[in-house]
Amino acid sequence: LNSPYDRYAHGDSKALNPDQLEGLNVFRSFVARCSQCHTPPLFTNQQVAVMGTPEPEGMPIDIGAQATAGAERFPVGFKVPTLRNIALTAPYMHSGRFGTLREATEFYTKGRGHAVPEGEENEAQ
């Protein structure tokens, strides 16, 4: 692995520019909480997460991992994807709800996400 992040993580303090460092700080913050599920070096914990991402208006609910045998305790949960090369994989979220990384990031930094959809109980607790 040889991305600017990888070089930075291995001690090259000049591998990330100021904007990238600011993004890394948001990524690691308790506000966005990205690093709780998107853990380096693959930037995924390979688990299922229930994020509370709303479905696009007019679309049926995607039950996600609940459709997988043995995953009934994860209603509307989805496998945490890697964030490697994320800028090349738009749109974002399981439903493609967000067209830009900024929109996806703001979903988490503005207090949304990491929540059970309105009217549902968190069965994973």
In which residue ranges do the predicted regions lie?
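Periplasmic c-type cytochrome electron-transfer domains
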Residues: L1-Q125
